[in-house]
Every structure is written in C-alpha cells, then in structure tokens.
C-alpha cells in the first residue's frame, strides 16, 4: 500500500528539484507567450486527484468499463458547463489536446485526398490547418488563404478560392492573428460552396467566453479549442458542435483517435469552465485586452517598432523586428536573459527560416493573471523595447532583470 508520507520530494528528489526550479522560473520571469497562462490551485487539485486512476473508455452512461459512476458525474459536469459557457448544442470534453480535437474534425468530415481550406501558417494560421509537414497537409489537398495588403484576412480572395476549389471543410482561426475574425462571413461562404464550417478558437476562447471577442458557435458547424491559453484551464482540448454532428465527432474521438479519456484532466477542465463563468473572469479578460493594447501602443507609437496589422483587437500581437536588424530567435534569447519570456514567430511571408524568424509574438494572458494592469503593461513594453534596442548589452539586461524582479515580487503568481 502507498503511504501518505511518500511525497514526490522523498520518492524522486531529482525530479522534485527540476519541478521546483520551474516553479521558481515562473515566479521570477514575466511570461509574454500568448499561448501560456497560469491555472488556479483548484484546477491543479482536480488534475492531481485520484481520478487519474480510473479508466473509462466511452462516454457518460455508455462505458466499456465498470466503476465509472463517479467519473460519469465529473465528465457530465464538464460537458454541461462547456455547452452553457459558449451556447453550444453539444460538446465533447475528451480530446487530449487541441490538435487531437482538430484531427477529429478532419476524420469526421473528410477523407484522405479531399480538399480543405485553412489560413496559411506563414500568415498566422496553425500547423493543424494544412501545414505540409502536419497530418492535415499530408492527407488532404490544402488550399490556403491569407492576408491582404493591410495584413487583415483577405475575405474576398478567400471567397474566390472557395468558389474555385469547393473544399469539403473551411477552417477559420489562427495562432498569430491579432484582429477580430468575421465568423459570419466565413459561414456564408462555406454554405455557398457546400463546405463544413469549422472554427478553431483556441487562442480566443477565454475572450469569447467573457464576451470580448465574437462567438463563432452560432455560425459554425463545429468549433474546436484548447482549454489552456486565454481560457486558463489545464492543457487539453474540446469540441463544440451542432447536435446533428455529435455522433460523428464523438466517434472520431473515441474510438477513432483515442482510447480511455484523461478523467483527471476532464475534471480540471470542469473547474476552469466554472471559473470562466464568473464576473471575476470577465474582468480578467477585459484587462487582458487592455494590457495587450497598451503594450502594442507603447511598442509601436512610442518605441518605433512595427506592429503586424498595425494594432491588436485581442490578447496577442506580432512585432516585426527587421528594422532593428535582429531575428526573432536572437530577440527571444535576449529577452530571456532579461527574464522576459516570449517566442520567436514568423511574420507574414517571413523571409527567415521557421526556427529563426523575423518577429516575436507577444501576449498578455499570463501577465494579466498575475494582476498586472495598464500601468505595469506600459512598464513591461518599455523593458521589452530597451532589450531589443541593445540585445547584446549585458548591462541593459541586468537593469531590466532587476526591474522584472521587482514587478514579479510585487505580483506573485500564487499569493498567500
């Protein structure tokens, strides 16, 4: 039998030390990666619960294993909360990731060799929307749409491509697009050409839940999302769908792609969905947008950096660093030395290789979870610009680290 005294620190001190070092890094660094966030203690408690012991192939009320009566309750709570949060007819909370949720859509509605249409990865899309090296690009004929000269989605060209190629599926959504997306226009185009309209709202889900970004659920046949990022839950995926597609999509997840679901993660998702329905979460998401706008304004208007698309209408934006003669890779490293975490990111039609890039992506979800407001957002933007103006200057990095340390101590991730 296991003893309650057999803690991780005692059983595996080597791993414990690595985890503690990561905990300290999260406390000591300002996190500006748009796809990262911090979860609540309640979410972590659910994910670390004894539900991890239970195998539960199938769905609530229709399991292939006995002893599922309580995980059925937990999973149904998650389903019901998710449907209510976004106004969906049906939902699946079992996908282990956003990518697996996306694979399920492709499995349910297309066959290898069929044509699908998605936003070009080079212009802000996601690799699961048709990148050549991804399953979606290997198995399907991919037609990509992109941006116009204003670096906004080129709806007119996308419409022309859809009429020409008549794809089985049209996917809207992005991993590096700062502006609002016109779901209704996508839906009209998809209907005209007879395509399934699929939205991947992974980056915007928290903003949508709080009412600060358009909700795609009324317009789309199916919506996928991650549960982390702006939604501030555990790492995982979900699918929202019209009732008529529930059987096909549920079958695509199980038995199509997965076996037993991760019921401990599903329980953590349920907690996050409850948190996302609170007034506090709405206030948080409003602050997320305000902080992103302040950082974009300071970096663009005051510090002379080019913001891709010229502005942000969400939690994220891209910085084009070509005028500074620094690559995204080097900028990421320089900011990391100053204890500011970002990710290198391609800009539209980037001439650099994907592991080098000409830009960085900046997001406000994690920093806002710490309690940062417009005041701190302005300070952070100036710190970022200071480093980018002298990326090899250790004295600048040291000064910025000191200021970052003061901010992090004032706003801990997990307070008392």
Swiss-Prot record:
Assigned protein family: Belongs to the SHMT family.
EC number of this enzyme: 2.1.2.1
Organism of origin: Dechloromonas aromatica (strain RCB)
CC annotations in GO: cytosol
Keywords from the UniProt entry: Amino-acid biosynthesis, Cytoplasm, One-carbon metabolism, Pyridoxal phosphate, Transferase
UniProt pathway: One-carbon metabolism; tetrahydrofolate interconversion; Amino-acid biosynthesis; glycine biosynthesis; glycine from L-serine: step 1/1
MF (Gene Ontology): glycine hydroxymethyltransferase activity; pyridoxal phosphate binding
Chief site of localization: cytoplasm
SUPFAM superfamilies: PLP-dependent transferases (SSF53383)
PANTHER family named in the record: SERINE HYDROXYMETHYLTRANSFERASE
Subunit relationships: Homodimer.
Xref: PROSITE patterns: SHMT
Gene3D superfamilies attached to this UniProt entry: Aspartate Aminotransferase, domain 1, Type I PLP-dependent aspartate aminotransferase-like (Major domain)
Site (Plays an important role in substrate specificity): 228
Subcellular locations according to the entry: Cytoplasm
One GO term of the biological process aspect: glycine biosynthetic process from serine
CDD domains the UniProt entry points to: SHMT (cd00378)
Protein's UniProt name: Serine hydroxymethyltransferase
Catalytic activity: (6R)-5,10-methylene-5,6,7,8-tetrahydrofolate + glycine + H2O = (6S)-5,6,7,8-tetrahydrofolate + L-serine
């Amino acid at each position: 039998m296991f003893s309650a005294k057999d803690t991780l620190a005692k059983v595996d001190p080597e791993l414990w030390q690595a985890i503690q070092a990561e905990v300290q890094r999260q406390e000591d660094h300002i996190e500006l990666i748009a796809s990262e966030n911090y979860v609540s203690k309640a979410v972590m408690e659910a994910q670390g619960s004894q539900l991890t012991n239970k195998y539960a192939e199938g769905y609530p009320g229709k399991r292939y294993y006995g002893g599922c009566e309580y995980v059925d309750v937990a999973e149904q709570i998650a389903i019901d909360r998710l449907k209510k949060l976004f106004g969906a007819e049906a939902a699946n909370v079992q996908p282990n990731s956003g990518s697996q949720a996306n694979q399920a859509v492709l499995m349910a509605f297309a066959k290898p060799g069929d044509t699908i249409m998605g936003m070009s990865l080079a212009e802000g899309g996601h690799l699961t929307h048709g990148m050549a090296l991804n399953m979606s690009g290997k198995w399907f004929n991919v037609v990509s749409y992109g941006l116009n000269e204003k670096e906004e989605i080129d709806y007119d060209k996308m419409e022309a491509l859809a009429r020409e190629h008549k794809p089985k599926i049209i996917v809207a959504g992005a991993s590096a697009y700062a502006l609002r997306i016109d779901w209704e226009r996508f839906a009209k185009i998809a209907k005209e050409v007879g395509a399934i309209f699929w939205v991947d709202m992974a980056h915007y889900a928290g903003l949508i839940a709080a009412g600060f970004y358009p909700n795609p659920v009324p317009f789309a046949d199916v919506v996928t999302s991650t549960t982390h990022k702006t939604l501030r839950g555990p790492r995982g995926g979900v699918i929202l769908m019209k009732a008529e597609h529930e059987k096909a999509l549920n079958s695509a997840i199980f038995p199509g792609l997965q076996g037993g679901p991760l019921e401990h993660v599903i329980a953590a998702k349920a907690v996050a969905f409850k948190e996302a329905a609170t007034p506090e979460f709405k206030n948080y998401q409003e602050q997320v947008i305000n902080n992103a706008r302040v950082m974009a304004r300071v970096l663009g208007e005051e510090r002379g950096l080019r913001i891709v698309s010229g502005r942000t209408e969400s939690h994220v934006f891209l910085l084009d660093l070509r005028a500074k003669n620094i690559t995204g890779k080097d900028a990421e490293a320089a900011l990391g030395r100053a204890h500011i975490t970002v990710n290198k990111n391609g800009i539209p039609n980037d001439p650099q290789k994907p592991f080098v890039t000409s830009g960085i992506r900046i997001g406000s979800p994690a920093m806002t979870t710490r309690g940062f407001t417009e005041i701190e957002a302005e300070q952070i933007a100036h710190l970022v610009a200071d480093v980018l103006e002298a990326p090899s200057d250790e004295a600048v990095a040291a000064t910025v680290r000191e200021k970052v340390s003061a901010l992090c101590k004032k706003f801990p991730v997990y307070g008392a």
